[in-house]
A protein has these predicted regions:
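Metal-dependent de-N-acetylase/amidase catalytic core
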Residues: 1-149
Length: 151
């Protein structure tokens, strides 16, 4: 992502939605609740990835994460002590940022279907987090499948 963004002429406006699949997002600001019908549709779509599902049953991940996010997501997005944002059984959390000049700015927390208000200021600066080196950049590969033929 960083290489793709670096190739854009500045200041190209960009909206970036991040989904924390391999680790939690430190600053989620979007909450998306969904029900059984949507979960069934997502599981059907996931079925197209036969090779990945042979390697690991990501169907369990989809419903397990979504159940956990339904329980924890409201407080992660809207703040500790916040009542649950939806009675639906599943949810996803995302971090949405916009590039403003050379900064990555987030808006207030909101439901996905609401979106930020039209005049909402994106005034939470997440640039330091997004420009920080990844763990892989800091310490190298940890648990990656390495190409045995690489030299």
């Amino acid at each position: 992502m960083q290489r793709a963004l670096a190739s854009l002429p500045a200041p190209t406006p960009v909206r970036w939605w991040m989904w924390g699949i391999w680790g939690d997002l430190p600053a989620p600001n979007v909450f998306f609740p969904f029900g059984e019908k949507d979960a069934a549709r997502l599981l059907h779509i996931l079925g197209a990835y036969e090779g990945e599902l042979e390697r690991n049953d990501y169907r369990r991940l989809l419903t397990g994460r979504a159940s956990a996010n339904a329980a924890l997501g409201s407080e992660r997005v809207f703040g500790f002590g916040t009542p649950r944002a939806s009675a639906l059984p599943y949810a996803e959390v995302l971090t949405e940022v916009r590039r403003v000049g050379h900064r990555w700015m987030a808006s207030r927390a909101h439901l996905l279907d609401e979106g930020p208000l039209p005049d909402e200021r994106f005034d939470v600066d997440l640039t330091a987090w997004l420009d920080a080196p990844s763990v892989r950049q800091l310490v190298g590969p940890i648990r990656e499948v390495l190409d045995e033929n690489a030299g």
